[in-house]
Amino acid sequence: MKLSRQFTVFGSAIFCVVIFSLYLMLDRGHLDYPRGPRQEGSFPQGQLSILQEKIDHLERLLAENNEIISNIRDSVINLSESVEDGPRGPAGNASQGSAHLHSAQLALQADPKDCLFASQSGNQHRDVQMLDVYDLIPFDNPDGGVWKQGFDIKYEADEWDREPLQVFVVPHSHNDPGWLKTFNDYFRDKTQYIFNNMVLKLKEDSSRKFIWSEISYLAKWWDIIDNPKKEAVKSLLQNGQLEIVTGGWVMADEATTHYFALIDQLIEGHQWLEKNLGVKPRSGWAIDPFGHSPTMTYLLKRAGFSHMLIQRVHYSVKKHFSLQKTLEFFWRQNWDLGSTTDILCHMMPFYSYDIPHTCGPDPKICCQFDFKRLPGGRYGCPWGVPPEAISPGNVQSRAQMLLDQYRKKSKLFRTKVLLAPLGDDFRFSEYTEWDLQYRNYEQLFSYMNSQPHLKVKIQFGTLSDYFDALEKSVAAEKKGGQSVFPALSGDFFTYADRDDHYWSGYFTSRPFYKRMDRIMESRLRTAEILYHLALKQAQKYKINKFLSSPHYTTLTEARRNLGLFQHHDAITGTAKDWVVVDYGTRLFQSLNSLEKIIGDSAFLLILKDKKLYQSDPSKAFLEMDTKQSSQDSLPKKNIIQLSAQEPRYLVVYNPFEQERHSVVSVRVNSATVKVLSDLGKAVEVQVSAVWKDMRTTSQAAYEVAFLAHLPPLGLKVYKILESQSSSSHLADYFLYNNDGQAESGIFHMKNMVDSGDAITIENSFLTLGFDRSGLMEKVRRKEDNKQQELKVQFLWYGTTNKRDKSGAYLFLPDGQGQPYVSLRTPFVRVTRGRIYSDVTCFLEHVTHKVRLYHIQGIEGQSMEVSNIVDIRSVHNREIVMRISSKINNQNRYYTDLNGYQIQPRRTMAKLPLQANVYPMSTMAYIQDAAHRLTLLSAQSLGASSMASGQIEVFMDRRLMQDDNRGLGQGVHDNKITANLFRILLEKRNGMNMEEDKKSPVSYPSLLSHMTSAFLNHPFLPMVLSGQLPSPAIELLSEFRLLQSSLPCDIHLVNLRTIQSKVGKGYSDEAALILHRKVFDCQLSSRAMGLPCSTTQGKMSIPKLFNNFAVESFIPSSLSLMHSPPDAQNTSEVSLSPMEISTSRIRLR
């Protein structure tokens, strides 16, 4: 009956569309014949052409009409399927609830031209492709002599006769913004003295040089020094003695970071430099991140950098590159069809960035030229031979010894220009070291430069001094347009510094804070966008209470705390326990302060009369529906107190740039609840239990879930009230393996004792089957009605019994992962409802939940997986979730890099297990010719594919010992940690696995991109605290920030208010950052329900924002440092595939 009624409605809709379209066609097709007398047998030529145009127009209208009817037909088919998949009755099988069909939403298609880029990628030539390099390297690690991981280097004495060796010695100090001490403690004890001495000691001699990287420290020092010191720093920068390299807020990790935060900390550093020093960095310096990503390379290139340096690369790769003389190369993006992303990169060849490993291949000799280690000091040389102070009596022999190392090192490169860094961690903090290093080297330089037969020119230099000399040398050698340096594509993970010591442990270490970081990124982005638009409204309506608020100062602090956490010993989980607490406290405090900014900004935007805006410094009128009580606790949902007399206002924000249908879930104090939409209509509600523990329901709190439809970047108001006439539906519960007494309260709860029925849940897209332990076993996609194996298992990895064991950095397992064995059959709880259904399995160390949403569109097509992990009781174990399928991926799998691009991987038998673990920021997938299985992640973790058909993700690790990389402790401060995922199974169309094997690139589907965005940017519900501040205040039903959805493949990365050039306030401009994503069209997109289309990267800027006019829109470099030479106000953006662009926008 229900089915026929739905068909009647939609049949009527089709009939109406047809009749209305025909009416329009006839109306538009009416011809204006001449009013004069008609001559028999003649028809004017002009009228014939008009008639032909009308006929052509009618044909186009018919085609459009056919397309509309086709779309409606597809919607009817989807509806019929959803109705057929309705409740089935028996408790053991799925009752999927209602499958919601989005009103007036048709599945839009991508423009075929937007599919071309992905299909063309992968055929372009590279001189060096890192996937191929791994095939070539034997990884046999023979003893190389004095250069243990290398080989013996020889040279002829006359090699520099035609062109002398040019050496640049670059003094530096690597300052971790937190590691063994907190950021503040390091600054107090070390860094401030480095800066103070730098100003004094560089002024003593104009030939002295120094480079600095971390702006977080420089900004902190700048705030406490006097004007004469500030002027001295500016003078050193102007005359080239001091160079700022990279200039980010920190030297960021490149494995576990997301590109949003990488860009943000770059902008924060570069904006600070522009305002305070007027300098623009042009050389990248990354000597300590544990492996290197091409994402960072791309960001530097688009920020305007010309060259960069990296250090921590697998020792076997360094050896291979040294043999091939490819340590300097143009690093090109895998996806680049041309060479627009090329940036010149220098890879340091030896073990470390310290002085013993930077002058040449023999650390025993190089250590003798680290003059801080002179006898009588605190440090010595581990090789047993101390440095000697340089004097007239030994300068000749010492100079020749050092020059020999420089010459040997130069043999690994293709030019006669050599870089020799001079520094280490927190060096130059004592004024005596400045004297010891500079004065001794000055004597060596003076001697070498005075001896023509040595054929060397040596000096102190900055990093850019070196690269400028290198490019000058190359320009002289260049013949016939052939580059001296090869083009390279790929990444440099996973890093190993010696033996089988792979640094794949830190991809997962301290996962609690990796998740907290991702939440912070989403909240900061929300605060940035809402604040800027609220600021524009406040300026328009002269709302001084908002304009004078400390919000911009608070926002800047949040940016800096997030930036600090991108440091390569912060987000990586590789700092001391108390330093981790310091990072966590900063994030926690900023999350709280961002909630105030979001609440106040949203309140202003949703107000009908902006002039009635009020604010309370102590709290926001709009409060988040979740609260985190401390830096190391999981967020908990607040309970909204309802009454029948006065409704509570719930304002929901959609942080996504497309129109969106998603589930909103809040907690209330009553099960008899009604939710009213912005139109005042009751919406369908699922009321579920809030569980005190796995068997006991709360009598004071209930979860209310409903489907919300929100505009892009929009706010919508719902009302919630207690009502006996509510249209809510109570969820039903079915308990398996229950040996205790469950308290059901108002809910129907059934013990499934000795039931032979399989556990299943389903929606209109998927049917999932589970074993009696509550773990998923199989899935049926209703698109093709085929059932496939899809098993979820948990595993333990231990650590080796050798002397070196796993720690914060290293993963050194004791063999293959061992199945998780539960002490008893797990208790399983099945929820069945109208909005969602789920299966929860309670293990000793994991509470594992798989949920399906009964929604048409994006969220209904994947499985939500949440794991609450608690391994505080175990020792030297790492817990993993494995997803197994029959997909024949042939040892090939894919992980993303920084949420920006996909990197193909190969499980290599010649490498140890730990080498086949790679970083995953947002997704990993495997595929064969028929299917792709994607695991989407809301936090950065380590991932692998140890066998065909498998994806493994590491969820937490607890290790009781140090792994001898300087931290001096294990990882045993574990927290109860929430990991959130989605699993997506897609059909591939007509794919060739041989082409997959050859291709160095791969792209997610559009559905996968969208699902990842939904996962990382969920709806944000906010509750009006109490009643409205004044009876006169009214709220709009919704506030649309954008006029319409952005194209499906364009992501609004940020709308970031730009700082004022004076004071600590804001300017009139914002940085609008856009990213055009590339997607694979070879995956099924049937009935995806996308409320957007693609436009080949083109967007009209004047039509972008709703309620805001665009005064100016001027393209810029990524971090706002540069404007293109032809930069001018423009009205259209045209983004190329994969590109991220920043523009300065002024709204009113």
Swiss-Prot record:
GO cellular component: cis-Golgi network; extracellular space; Golgi apparatus; Golgi medial cisterna; Golgi membrane
Enzyme class at the top of the EC tree: hydrolase
Regulation of catalytic or functional activity: Inhibited by swainsonine.
EC number: 3.2.1.114
Residue ranges of the TM segments: 6-26
Pfam families documented for this protein: Alpha-mann_mid, Glyco_hydro_38C, Glyco_hydro_38N, Laman-like_dom
Binding-site positions, Zn(2+): 174, 176, 288, 568
Subcellular compartments: Golgi apparatus membrane
Note on cofactor: Binds 1 zinc ion per subunit.
Record field: catalytic activity: N(4)-{beta-D-GlcNAc-(1->2)-alpha-D-Man-(1->3)-[alpha-D-Man-(1->3)-[alpha-D-Man-(1->6)]-alpha-D-Man-(1->6)]-beta-D-Man-(1->4)-beta-D-GlcNAc-(1->4)-beta-D-GlcNAc}-L-asparaginyl-[protein] + 2 H2O = 2 alpha-D-mannopyranose + an N(4)-{beta-D-GlcNAc-(1->2)-alpha-D-Man-(1->3)-[alpha-D-Man-(1->6)]-beta-D-Man-(1->4)-beta-D-GlcNAc-(1->4)-beta-D-GlcNAc}-L-asparaginyl-[protein]
Active site residues according to the UniProt entry: 288
Any GO MF annotation of the entry: mannosidase activity
SMART domains: Alpha-mann_mid (SM00872)
Sites bearing Phosphoserine, chain numbering: 80, 82
Chain ranges on the Lumenal side, renumbered to this chain: 27-1148
Region (Disordered): 1121-1148
Pathway stated in the Swiss-Prot or TrEMBL entry: Protein modification; protein glycosylation
Protein name (Swiss-Prot/TrEMBL): Alpha-mannosidase 2
Organism: Rattus norvegicus
Upper taxonomic lineage: Eukaryota, Metazoa, Chordata, Craniata, Vertebrata
Encoding gene (name): Man2a1
